[in-house]
């Protein structure tokens, strides 16, 4: 189940709010400029589906986002517990960073924890299958895929270079809960 846990940045052990209804998650995140939606596939997606099949299943929603926000590049990222670089990738994504463009992810399968550091608060968004999250450019955040990752996500970019991070050097992520496997 998708969830949103809100903390004050100085109290990682004490959540201020825990939400599990998609509408509540979406409205709370909208207050800080983050988009959260639930999508349904237009066609069933089989295990092991190709990038093209995944994109085709969500073509209507993807095209709508491209028109609305000017995204030019779409791809599919898939990571599981057999990936040879899972530990290195997890460590990299767990460092607080920001991007010069929106970070848009739609979870086709599995789950991941997006943690957003906005002003004095930390918003931990557990994204699962059918969740779309759009983190605005410049937002400090980190991502945890867990020790045993399993996710397939559609990514949209307005930068043809794809994922380009600017790391903040802040170790705040080390003080907050990780994704439980």
From Swiss-Prot:
Give me the reactions it catalyses.
Answer: 1,2-dihydroxy-5-(methylsulfanyl)pent-1-en-3-one + O2 = 3-(methylsulfanyl)propanoate + CO + formate + 2 H(+); 1,2-dihydroxy-5-(methylsulfanyl)pent-1-en-3-one + O2 = 4-methylsulfanyl-2-oxobutanoate + formate + 2 H(+)
Q: How is the cofactor bound?
A: Binds 1 Fe(2+) cation per monomer.
Q: Which Gene3D superfamilies match?
A: Jelly Rolls
Q: Which GO terms describe its biological process?
A: L-methionine salvage from methylthioadenosine; L-methionine salvage from S-adenosylmethionine
InterPro entries hit by this protein: ARD, ARD_bac, RmlC-like_jellyroll, RmlC_Cupin_sf
Q: Where is this site: May play a role in transmitting local conformational changes?
A: 102
**Pathway of action:** Amino-acid biosynthesis; L-methionine biosynthesis via salvage pathway; L-methionine from S-methyl-5-thio-alpha-D-ribose 1-phosphate: step 5/6
**Keyword match 4Fe-4S:** no
* Source organism (scientific name): Pseudomonas paraeruginosa (strain DSM 24068 / PA7)
The cofactors it requires, by name, are: Fe(2+); Ni(2+)
Q: How does it assemble?
A: Monomer.
Any idea what this protein is called? Acireductone dioxygenase
EC number(s) of the enzyme?
1.13.11.54, 1.13.11.53
Keywords for this entry? Amino-acid biosynthesis, Dioxygenase, Iron, Metal-binding, Methionine biosynthesis, Nickel, Oxidoreductase
Q: In this chain's numbering, which residues are marked as the site (Important to generate the dianion)?
A: 105
Family (UniProt): Belongs to the acireductone dioxygenase (ARD) family.
Quote the function comment for this protein: Catalyzes 2 different reactions between oxygen and the acireductone 1,2-dihydroxy-3-keto-5-methylthiopentene (DHK-MTPene) depending upon the metal bound in the active site. Fe-containing acireductone dioxygenase (Fe-ARD) produces formate and 2-keto-4-methylthiobutyrate (KMTB), the alpha-ketoacid precursor of methionine in the methionine recycle pathway. Ni-containing acireductone dioxygenase (Ni-ARD) produces methylthiopropionate, carbon monoxide and formate, and does not lie on the methionine recycle pathway.
Residues annotated as binding Fe(2+) are 97, 99, 103, 141
Q: Tell me which residues are marked as the site May play a role in metal incorporation in vivo.
A: 96
| Residue numbers binding Ni(2+) | 97, 99, 103, 141
Q: Which GO terms describe its molecular function?
A: acireductone dioxygenase (Ni2+-requiring) activity; acireductone dioxygenase [iron(II)-requiring] activity; iron ion binding; nickel cation binding
Give the classification, highest ranks. Bacteria, Pseudomonadati, Pseudomonadota, Gammaproteobacteria, Pseudomonadales
